[in-house]
Amino acid sequence: MQDVTTEPAGPILRLRGIGRRFGGLDAVRDVDLDVAHGERRAILGPNGAGKTTLFNVISGDMPQTSGTIEFLGQDIGAISAPGRTRLGMGRTYQKSRLFLGLSVEDNLYLAVLGSRGGHQRLTRRAIDGEMRDRARELARAVGLERQIGTLVGSISHGEQRQLEVAMARATEPKLMLLDEPASGLSRGERLALTDLLLELDKSITLILIEHDMDVALRVAQNVTMMHDGRKIVEGTPDEIRANALVHELYLGGRVTDDGIEVTS
């Protein structure tokens, strides 16, 4: 018998005319975006481009001022961040939300407990075999099985980022949002993180908010470039590398008839 299982029709995430206003300032203006199931998408831009504001609108941490947002074909504009998590969104934040005084394992227990929904408290009695197995599985998936009993404050910044990715996976999300996960990492740590993101289950859609062009272009299949709150360019990594406007606005270059003049 032929397998007739297919992915849901249409994009997993669709934004139309998304705007976010703070007083008289448009932090995000009229953004349209379609992200396909299983796609790795980077939203790239310098500081102040509106990337994190757009992240917060998608995640539900901040309401949009205008426009519509659909996830899996459902309008989620009025759904809270926890509600979006239950629908299948996972996320990591630029500012760490880890408990540095707890072990890697205990942080994972908290993520697993949270994935079960409702108001629950982490106690030793609450930790069952299923939770323990799931925490160790998540640690193993990001290469932290040897650090499972180590206090989070004692592991490297790069390992903390890996732990955040593991915790975001606890809910088995269909879409993962990562806000500048490479921020503050050394070159080696950035490479390790990008390798990890490339090895994620290909059924998980990934949206990477990033100001580091090397990270964005290494991880993403498609890139959306933002500037001054607007989407200005969209394309594959090769198309982004070759785009004169990207060089002029992002790399500090100046477009001339002779090519791109980059200033130091």
Identify the residue ranges that each predicted region occupies.
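Glycine-rich phosphate-binding loops of nucleotide-dependent enzymes
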Residues: 2-264
